[in-house]
């Protein structure tokens, strides 16, 4: 095998169009991201059809910019990695069809990547010496998982949400208290001005050994609290609501992740996904894990949110295992972790 394997990666599962060039799964030569946040902000969330159209408008330029920044041409690329699920089907199709076209035209192998696997692999970029096994907490707008990574590309899901993802709950609560979209960063910011002990919102604790999550109850409790305040004409302290809600979500995420580590006897937790940039989650996880002798690994913000570099990293580890994807592959919006 060549000393250096160069992956051109493409990500378009939601509202970021991204392309990257990644070498050997850990070195990022370029990572171009065209965000649509300003486009969707006025709608209070991502509009799937609008997202697809925006991907179509920019994908060619984004891929070319990624190649140019890396000082590469397609001749220098060994394989093309692309997200094929989970995500918004229309958005996924834009990146997938573009990648399939490149693979067909150049004869380069295509590697379909699970978006969640990409988030986990972002840690290999930031932590060059990181190797499995380790635990990973994946928290984003659409996904919440506790994953035991046994080996490269081999996962065991120990816990997942039974309803709303953590990031989805953040967005809905932010909208309810008038903070707008995207909710996660705005709740994180205003929470710094609030008292996290001001309101006791419930935590979902299941009565068996499951490590699953449920955030719909917390979200509903916040909405009920707001409705009662409005009906009584009482003032609502947005900062206190945000801080108390955030703490209730973070406490459950941290507790279950530490339990998972103890059950598998691992001493490393990697964090992935957009909600991993939340300051309360970072601080609480580091503080509580220190008490248990568990190391916490958290990538920088740009690698927590959707990006193609993480897809390139995951694609590399698939490539060296000899896995290739047929050009007949289709988008799978509800793709499960570990499915191929």
UniProtKB/Swiss-Prot annotation:
Cofactor(s) the protein requires to work: Fe(2+)
Keyword Transferase: yes
CDD domains: ASKHA_NBD_TsaD_bac (cd24133)
Catalytically driven reaction(s): L-threonylcarbamoyladenylate + adenosine(37) in tRNA = N(6)-L-threonylcarbamoyladenosine(37) in tRNA + AMP + H(+)
GO biological process terms on file: tRNA threonylcarbamoyladenosine modification
Keywords from the UniProt entry: Acyltransferase, Cytoplasm, Iron, Metal-binding, Transferase, tRNA processing
Molecular function per GO: iron ion binding; N(6)-L-threonylcarbamoyladenine synthase activity
Gene3D superfamilies assigned: 3.30.420.40
EC code(s) of this entry: 2.3.1.234
NCBIfam families: gcp_kae1 (TIGR00329), T6A_TsaD_YgjD (TIGR03723)
Family assignment from sequence similarity: Belongs to the KAE1 / TsaD family.
Biological role stated in the UniProt entry: Required for the formation of a threonylcarbamoyl group on adenosine at position 37 (t(6)A37) in tRNAs that read codons beginning with adenine. Is involved in the transfer of the threonylcarbamoyl moiety of threonylcarbamoyl-AMP (TC-AMP) to the N6 group of A37, together with TsaE and TsaB. TsaD likely plays a direct catalytic role in this reaction.
Protein name: tRNA N6-adenosine threonylcarbamoyltransferase
Organism: Clostridium botulinum (strain Hall / ATCC 3502 / NCTC 13319 / Type A)
Organism ancestry: Bacteria, Bacillati, Bacillota, Clostridia, Eubacteriales
């Amino acid at each position: 095998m060549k000393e250096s394997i160069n992956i051109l990666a493409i990500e378009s599962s939601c509202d970021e169009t991204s392309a990257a060039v990644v070498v050997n799964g850990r070195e990022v030569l370029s990572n171009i991201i065209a965000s649509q946040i300003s486009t969707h902000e006025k709608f209070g969330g991502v509009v799937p059809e609008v997202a697809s159209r925006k991907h179509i408008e920019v994908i060619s330029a984004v891929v070319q910019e990624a190649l140019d920044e890396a000082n590469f041409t397609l001749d220098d690329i060994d394989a093309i990695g692309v997200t094929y699920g989970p995500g918004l089907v229309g958005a996924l199709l834009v990146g997938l069809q573009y990648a399939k076209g490149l693979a067909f035209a150049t004869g380069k192998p295509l590697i379909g990547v699970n978006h969640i696997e990409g988030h986990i692999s972002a840690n290999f970029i930031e932590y060059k010496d990181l190797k499995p096994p380790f635990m990973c907490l994946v928290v984003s707008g659409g996904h919440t998982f506790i994953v035991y990574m046994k080996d490269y590309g081999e996962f065991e899901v120990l816990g997942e949400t039974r309803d709303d993802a953590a990031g989805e709950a953040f967005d809905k609560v932010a909208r309810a208290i008038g903070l707008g979209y995207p909710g996660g960063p705005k709740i994180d910011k205003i929470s710094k001005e609030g008292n996290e002990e001001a309101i006791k919102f419930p935590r979902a604790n299941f009565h068996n050994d499951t490590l699953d999550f449920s955030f719909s109850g917390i979200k509903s409790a916040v909405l009920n609290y707001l409705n009662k305040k409005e009906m009584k004409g009482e003032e609502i302290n947005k900062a206190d609501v945000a801080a108390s809600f955030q703490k209730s979500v973070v406490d459950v995420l941290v507790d279950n992740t530490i339990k998972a580590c103890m059950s598998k006897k691992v001493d490393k937790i990697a964090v992935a996904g957009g909600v991993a940039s939340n300051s309360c989650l970072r601080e609480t996880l580091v503080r509580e894990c220190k008490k248990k002798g568990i190391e916490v690994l958290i990538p920088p913000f740009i690698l927590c949110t959707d990006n193609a570099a993480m897809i390139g990293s995951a694609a590399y580890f698939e490539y060296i295992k000899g896995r290739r994807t047929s050009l007949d592959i289709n988008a799978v919006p509800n793709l499960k972790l570990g499915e191929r």
